[in-house]
């Protein structure tokens, strides 16, 4: 057995899920370094296919749920790179080549969960490959400029990184041809799949644990809340500036590279709690005046958790959040600035804090774990049984070592 196998169980890879009984299944995930929204989707599939082999680039042992850690996990050659678990994002240029090491063997179904290279796995001829797509490769498409910002003070390296991303974009588009069926996490992502890959997809939104995230008996307090990684594209500085300028209280839960900079701009009413466990986050959802969500997300699971706890949500009305948050459960605003967020807070408070907790709860319950499981497994069953014919354009596989195309959208 390969040294990269993290579980030595002699699994057969066969499913015991209704409608999928007896199938040999391979699961593919970009990397396994912690339990985030994507890993919660993966966990559902691991429970449905406990004997499947799980392929990934790298695996941080003990960082995932028992359902995931109990799988047979096969990693790529990147796992053997010293320090990879701390610096894996810097190894982006090596990821397409590493993905070529995935060999799924004789299986009946391949399911990838991808925002980077997982969809590049190649199934045996005639085997359906369903990709649950969090977004097309972020670094090559809509996140390209943000990735290059890290090299703004090094023009030569920035130019080289830009050329690399152009080649990555070409490779990413070609690798999509190995997917027989795309499933998008939101209408926003469905549109990107159509734009970048010229492919149709079905939308199945990610799950929220509405049994855990539920209203409590706590009274609403005066503080606003942000729950987020403290990284640039989350735009947490806009919430901090809006609350600092208006003298409002704000609690920020989360860690990231931006924390020091954000703390310097924050007023006395802003408190940083750092990383917190789920029970602390749930407690703050139950007590906050409202959740502030200034980032543009592919879907946005945090607002749904807040809604499940009965909290209002004031969010930037772009991306996936615009599909779940509206005036009935909070407010949205169109311009990604601190001024626009502050104006939204002022207007909402002037209206008397209108909010319907029961409606917010129902909105979240439509995305509960059992709903997600039923929809996703039902879709997989229909694919396997030929009810969703594949529509794959005749695009050849382009090795990452080839020269990038010009004028790629």
Describe each region flagged by the PLM.
Residues 286-298, 311-312:
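Acidic donor-binding loop of glycosyltransferase active sites
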Residues 214-251:
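Conserved donor-binding/catalytic core segment of Leloir-type glycosyltransferases
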Residues 260-283:
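Nucleotide-activated donor-binding/catalytic signature segment of Leloir-type glycosyltransferases, i.e.
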Residues 51-119:
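Active-site donor-binding segments of glycosyltransferases and PAPS-dependent sulfotransferases
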Residues 283-288, 376:
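Short alpha-helical donor nucleotide-sugar binding micro-motif in glycosyltransferases
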Residues 336, 352-381, 388-389, 393:
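A charged, aromatic-enriched C-terminal amphipathic alpha-helix characteristic of glycosyltransferases
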């Amino acid at each position: 057995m390969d040294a990269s196998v993290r579980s030595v169980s002699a699994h057969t890879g066969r499913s015991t899920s209704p409608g999928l009984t007896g199938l040999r299944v391979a699961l593919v995930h970009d990397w396994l370094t912690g339990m985030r929204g994507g890993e919660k989707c993966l966990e559902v599939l691991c429970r449905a296919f406990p004997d499947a082999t799980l392929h990934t680039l790298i695996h941080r042992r003990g960082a995932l749920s028992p359902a995931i850690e109990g799988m047979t996990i096969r990693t790529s050659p990147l796992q053997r790179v010293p320090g990879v678990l701390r610096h894996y994002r810097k190894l982006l240029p090596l990821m397409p080549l590493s993905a070529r090491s995935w060999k799924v063997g004789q299986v009946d179904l391949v399911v990838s969960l991808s925002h980077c290279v997982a969809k590049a796995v190649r199934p045996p001829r005639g085997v359906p490959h369903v990709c649950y797509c969090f977004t097309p490769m972020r670094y090559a498409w809509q996140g390209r400029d943000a990735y290059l910002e890290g090299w703004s003070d090094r023009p030569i390296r920035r130019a080289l990184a830009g050329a690399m991303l152009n080649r990555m974009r070409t490779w990413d588009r070609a690798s999509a041809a190995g997917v027989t069926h795309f499933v998008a996490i939101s209408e926003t992502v469905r549109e990107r799949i159509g734009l970048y890959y010229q492919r149709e997809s079905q939308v199945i939104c990610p799950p929220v644990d509405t049994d855990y995230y539920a209203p409590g008996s706590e009274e609403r307090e005066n503080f606003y809340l942000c729950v987020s990684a403290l990284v640039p594209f989350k735009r947490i500085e806009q919430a901090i500036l809006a609350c600092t300028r208006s003298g409002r209280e704000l609690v920020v839960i989360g860690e990231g590279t931006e924390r020091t900079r954000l703390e310097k701009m924050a007023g006395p009413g802003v408190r940083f709690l750092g990383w917190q466990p789920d029970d602390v986050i749930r407690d703050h959802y139950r007590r906050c005046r409202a959740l502030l969500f200034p980032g543009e997300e592919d879907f946005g699971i945090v607002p749904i958790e807040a809604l499940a706890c009965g909290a209002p949500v004031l969010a930037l009305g772009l991306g996936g959040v615009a599909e779940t948050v509206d005036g009935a459960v909070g407010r949205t605003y169109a311009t990604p600035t601190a001024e626009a967020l502050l104006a939204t807070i002022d207007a909402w408070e002037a209206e008397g804090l209108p909010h319907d907790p029961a409606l917010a709860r129902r909105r979240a319950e439509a995305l509960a774990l059992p709903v997600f499981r039923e929809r996703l497994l039902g879709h997989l069953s229909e694919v396997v049984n030929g009810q969703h014919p594949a529509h794959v354009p005749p695009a050849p596989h382009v090795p990452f070592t080839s020269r990038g195309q010009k004028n790629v959208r």
